[in-house]
Structures are given as structure tokens and as C-alpha cells.
Amino acid sequence: MDKMFCYQCQETAKGTGCTSIGVCGKTSETSGLQDLLLYTEKGVAAYSTVFRKNGKAKELLEGKVNRYLINSLFITITNANFDDNAILDEIKAGLKLREELKALATDEEKKEAEKYGADLVNWYYESNEDLIKFSENQSVVGVLRTENEDVRSLRELIMYGLKGMAAYAEHAFNLGKTSEEIFAFVEEALLGTMDDSLNAEQLVALTIKTGEYGVKVMALLDEANTSALGTPEITKVKIGAGKRPGILISGHDLWDLKQLLEQSKDSGIDIYTHSEMLPGHGYPELKKYSHFYGNYGNAWWDQRKDFTNFNGPIIFTTNCIVPPVKNATYKDRVFTTNAAGYPGWKRIKVNADGTKDFSEVIELAKICQAPVEVESGEITVGFAHNQVLSLADKVVENIKSGAIKRFVVMSGCDGRMSQRHYYTEFAENLPKDTIILTSGCAKYKYNKLNLGDINGIPRVLDAGQCNDSYSWAVVALKLKEVFGLNDINELPIVFNIAWYEQKAVIVLLALLYLGIKNIHVGPTLPGFLSPNVAKVLVENFGIAGITTVEEDLKKFGLYEGSGLDN
């Protein structure tokens, strides 16, 4: 048998699955432990769902279980955590939590929990050696435990959607926003992937329901971000480098960024964002800090070069981590927090009240050299739904006059594959009466191009992070209302989405739930879609891949003059 099996990301080996080491860099041991962590979590969920329905052990659910459910999923997202010891600790914490729940269960509740498998809720090992050995049993804890290819495909599609949802839920959680409804659904979906009584049709329904809850969790995170940090504003962001030492913060957790800015003010250093942290510059409660200098570098996959040039400490608040080469000059100045982790990298200290202590990072930054300037100029951010809707009259006026003919949603992820240059060429060759709506790190393929504007409206509108794809759904629904259309698919909006990891999966499922059809996904279709499941998505939702820029522009009707009236 192969050492591992993982096919959750776009770059999976040969488009079918990694079997000896992950293309992402994770070892077979790490892959097995991540599988075991999810198996452990499902055992916790088997009990917590019973208690939640019965209104029992509320304090335990709110105090420990809810956070565990989302954090365990988040740890297993592509490029989030490579630290086997951290994953082992999370497995042990889950076993302890499961046993704590079990001790409170009646015989009837135990029987209900065991319907997903007696082994799921009763297995137990204490030593790392035993846990590692058990994690190697792919037929029990791994993806391949499901023999039927189509059932496996649907179960994993749900799991990957859940992982993306959990990431967004954790960010909202960190900002004090939670939802009992969302936690209950996470349990339902986790256990749905263990329920052998569910047929393919029922799993398809659960997949779309996952998309429904994806919309809910993105709305929750949007509320969390804006209530704590203000509504994003159109903001120009410097992409050069200053003369002072700096700290580079990567990932997605805006609350960590807020705390870092507050703790580092008046310290003589600057704060820079990296990759998906770029949208932070649009939030009033973040941009008010004078030492919030700009954005440094490009998308996550190019970080080895960017981190070397930056010279100062780097903080990963979440994924995406690229394992450093052995002689990397920056590996002793990288810190992690939340679900992110890498062997040998330092952890950010967490205070008793849950706040972070960034003092060690700040002190290190003071003795580092300033970043090397590798580019200069500015890029514009801050076009989330509130900002775009405030311009609604201007947008509608330009649509009615014919100045704007089409919108192209190019949200999603960036990645290493050379095929992704397609998105740069696609953006460059769009008609001048077309506006790109983007979010996520896919933007790095074209956000530094000079694509101009249409009567003062930039031709690239950046809503923010991957979760801010929610903004384009809000905008689309508003435009549908303004133009009196019966179907959202009648709008002059094309969806050409780039995916890489599981947050893009929940965005896709959310769009499907909202009824959006004919979405194109690239640079390749997911390897975890079996032929039959892919056929269902094609026939029911019009899902398709990409071809060449020239062919796709024709296919999408993206030529001068095409639009709402054509």
C-alpha cells in the first residue's frame, strides 16, 4: 500500500493524488496524522451533536468543543500545519474531550453516538508511538476507507468545504462572533461523511447544504470584521519598502494584525502585509496606524524569495506556509499562531485572556535590517460590497450607458503552476468595457497590471480575502434587483475562478447554493471529483474547466460590445 493518500489541493500529484509525499511538502507521517486528527474530531462530534440536540453540557460545548471542531479542521487545510507534535497534541486533546463527553452521556446517548461506528468513539491510545502507528491505517482513518469512488468523492467534497468553512468560522470566533447553528451543521456534515446509510443523492444534497452554510459563515465573518475594524474603504497601498526595520504578517487573521499594530506603535518599526493580508489596509481601524507601511512581495507560493529579501521577522497567522529550504536565511525569524505551525518555528505567546503577546517579534524586528525594495508603486484595495454598493448609482449608470458591458469574477487562489499565467493573459485581453471583480490571492496574477478604469471606476475591484467572495454574491443580488431580473444568471457576470485549496472549495459550494451556474474552475478541475460526480456538477450547474485565453474569451462572450443587452 502507498504511504499516504491525499488529493485535496489543486497541485496534487498527477492530478490524482499524492502517495509518498505531498506536493505541498507534507510528509506521509504528517498526512497520516492529519487524517487521524479528522477521525478523532468525528468521534468528538458523535457525542457533541447528541448533547447539542438535547441541550446538554452547554458550558463544555461553548468552552471547549466549538473551538476544537473548527481548529482541528483548519489545521488540516493545505499548507497550514506541518508540525507533527502540534498535530499529535491536538489529537490527544480531542481524545480527552471525547472521553469527557462520554463520561456525561447516558446509555441511550452512548448508543446514539455509536451509530457512526463503535470504533470511532471508543478507540484510544496515549503514546505518540501508538498514535503514529494507528495513523498509518489508511483503511480506517484515511480517505481510502471509503471504497466506492463516487461516495468517496462526495464525502471529500463535503470535508473540503467544511475545512474552508472552519477557517472562516475561526476568524469570526477570534473576533467574538459565533453561531450555534454553524457549529451544529459542522457536526452534522462531519458525521454525514461517516454515515453509510446516506446514498449519493443524499450526499449531493448535503454538499449543497454545505454551500448554504458557507454563505452563512462568510456573512458572519463579514459582520465580525466590519463590526470590529470598520467597513473597508478604497485605499491605495504602497508596494515598495521603507527605511526602517519591519515585521511581515501573512495569513488571514485580521484580529492578529490589529493586535500587532497596537503593540508595535511607537517602537520605531513598520508593519507590512503579505499575500492575503493585503486587504487589511482598507479597514479604518487598521489603516489609522501611521507605521502600517504597505504590502510586501507577491502571492504565498513565492514566499521563499520574499522572506529572504524582507530581512525582518515574519508571522504566519494561518496558511499558506511553503516549507523553507535547508539553508533558508529566514527560518529563525518566523513565528506562527492559531492553526498554523512548522517544526522549529516559534509560537506567538497567548495570554490568559486570549490576546496575543507580540513582544518577542517586535524586539527581534528592532535589530533587523530594513526590507530590500524589490518593487515600487501602489495598488488599490477596499472594494468590498458596502463600498461597491455605495457606488451603485455610478455603476448602474455606466452599465446603462454601455460604458460597462461585463463583469468577470476572478476570485480564488494563486499557485505555482505555470498554467496559472493564463489568468494574467486573460485579464490583459479582456475588452476595455469589462471590469474584474476579485478576492483572494488570485489577484496577484493581475493586480499590478495597468488596466486603467472606466469613467473613474478601476477595472480591477478587489473585495479582499478569499472569504470576501461573499461581497460579489451580495453585489450580484443587488444588481439583479436593480435591473428587475428573475435569475441571477441573467446578469452580465462571468465566473472564472482559480482554485488551490479548501477555502476555494467552500466559495464554490456557496456560489452553487446561491444558484449561480456556468462557473469555470481552473487551472485544472479537482482531482477529488470522480467522473460521475463531475458529470453531476456539469449537468446540473454547468461547471466547466478552462481551455485557452482566446477560446475562453469567445466562450464567455467577452468581446467588445457584449453585455446585458446582447
Curated annotation (Swiss-Prot):
One of its GO terms (biological process) is response to hydrogen peroxide. One of its GO terms (molecular function) is metal ion binding. It catalyses: A + NH4(+) + H2O = hydroxylamine + AH2 + H(+). [4Fe-4S] cluster binds at C6, C9, C18, C24. Its cofactor is [4Fe-4S] cluster; hybrid [4Fe-2O-2S] cluster. It is found in: Cytoplasm. Hybrid [4Fe-2O-2S] cluster binds at H252, E276, C320, C413, C441, C466, E501, K503. Keywords: 4Fe-4S, Cytoplasm, Iron, Iron-sulfur, Metal-binding, Oxidoreductase. The modification Cysteine persulfide is found at C413. SUPFAM superfamilies: Prismane protein-like. GO terms for cellular component: cytoplasm. Gene3D superfamilies: 1.20.1270.20, 3.40.50.2030. Pfam families: Prismane. InterPro entries: HCP/CODH, Hydroxylam_reduct, Prismane-like_a/b-sand, Prismane-like_sf, Prismane_a-bundle. Catalyzes the reduction of hydroxylamine to form NH(3) and H(2)O. HAMAP family: Hydroxylam_reduct (MF_00069). This is Hydroxylamine reductase. The gene is hcp.
